Amino acid sequence: VELTAAKKVVVFDYGFGNVRSAERALARVGAEVEITRDYDAAMNADGLLVPGVGAFAACMRGLLDARGDWVIDRRLSGGRPVMGICVGMQILFSRGIEHGVEAEGLEEWPGTVGPLAADVVPHMGWNTVAAPADSELFAGLDADARFYFVHSYAVHDWTQETHNPLIAAPKVTWATHGKPFVAAVENGALWATQFHPEKSGDAGAQLLTNWIGTL
């Protein structure tokens, strides 16, 4: 049996993510993991994971201070995989509005992160998702697989249009809490989830395995 080298994943450490739980989850599925904000390490890794917890504006400030916006942009321009989790997904959209304060995001995708349209907020706990049939991220997972969410804000409208037939349209996965919201996106080298795969048990482990399999 030919042994393949473990994939190297950098968990980007900019002060606003559950970096240790992400590290443990990735290591459990066979990745070689480093927690760092070092530019060269983040650029050279097979995969870059950007976790995020807290307020949208604060996460963006932390990411900019760590030059994470540049790292993400440079990796994506070279087709190098990047994955965002929770607020690490939200900051990939155009902007976020929290408590009436608007902050700019990275604008990889059009859309506004706003308060969840639900009676019970935050959305905390396990929920199912509706993934496209051709999803790579959710490959091998049943439709009733459950993932762990904890958030008060989300993207309720996916507005990106792909008119170029040579460019594959992003694959968008939805979940519902009150109104439907974006639960995950697969867009070329850039994937992201609103839920926490590192806290989602076997389903989350399968999902991370699927991501690592693309690196």
Where is each model-derived feature located?
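Cysteine-nucleophile active-site neighborhood
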Residues: G54-W126
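Pocket-forming structural segment of enzyme catalytic cores
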Residues: S94-H177
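Acyltransferase
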Residues: V1-E2, A6, A189-L215
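Structural signature of beta-strand start/N-cap positions in the alpha/beta core
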Residues: E32, G47, P81-M83, R146
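Short, surface-exposed beta-strand/loop micro-motifs that present aromatic residues
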Residues: W174, K179-E186
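Short acidic low-complexity segments
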Residues: V33-N44
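Short acidic/histidine-rich motifs immediately flanking catalytic phosphotransfer sites
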Residues: A42-G52
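N-terminal beta1-alpha1 ligand-phosphate binding loop
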Residues: V9-G30, E198
